[in-house]
């Protein structure tokens, strides 16, 4: 929960229950970045540090409404085993590990891992705050394109509502 607290404003942080539900419903879609992956040091199980995560769920298809994009939504209502759309519900890296390419490399590695296991995927979806330029850069560099905007999707610590951009990447898989 330390990563969530250091990465997101209070009003859009997800609580422990949401993370536990994600782990229970789709454990293959919850991937962590350990300091071992960055420096060759011992991993979390040997005293290393968990410094990032990516949470996801499978959807039957790209949604036709905004409701599934809400913070803290019930994954058990949205998740569809064998679904063709991967929704990246949360992605974060501790601030001290940002700025040197770690986030982008981890994001790509996490998606590669999920894609390898989930052969039915045809698209990947996420929502990002319009003002989170570093995150948008990572997503754009990985082939995600803006689809539409959700007005007032994110609330800052200053109680200012900011728009979210839903982005999608179509997978072109070899048969």
Feature locations, PLM:
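Conserved beta-strand-loop-alpha-helix junction that forms the acyl-donor binding cleft
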Residues: 95-98, 124-136, 152-162
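Conserved acetyl-CoA-binding loop of GNAT-fold acetyltransferases
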Residues: 140-149
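Short hydrophobic/aromatic beta-strand element in the GNAT-like acyltransferase core
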Residues: 28-32, 53, 90, 125, ...
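Conserved GNAT acetyl-CoA-binding A-motif
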Residues: 107, 114-130
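Alpha-helical elements of Rossmann-like donor-binding domains used by nucleotide-donor carbohydrate transfer enzymes
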Residues: 2-3, 18, 105, 109, ...
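Conserved acetyl-CoA-binding loop-helix of GNAT-fold acetyltransferases
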Residues: 93, 99-114, 137, 141
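Conserved acyl-donor/pantetheine-binding loop and adjacent beta-alpha core of acyl/acetyltransferases
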Residues: 46-47, 55-90, 153-159
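Active-site rim helix/loop that mediates acceptor-substrate recognition in acyltransferases
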Residues: 9-43, 51, 55-61, 73-77
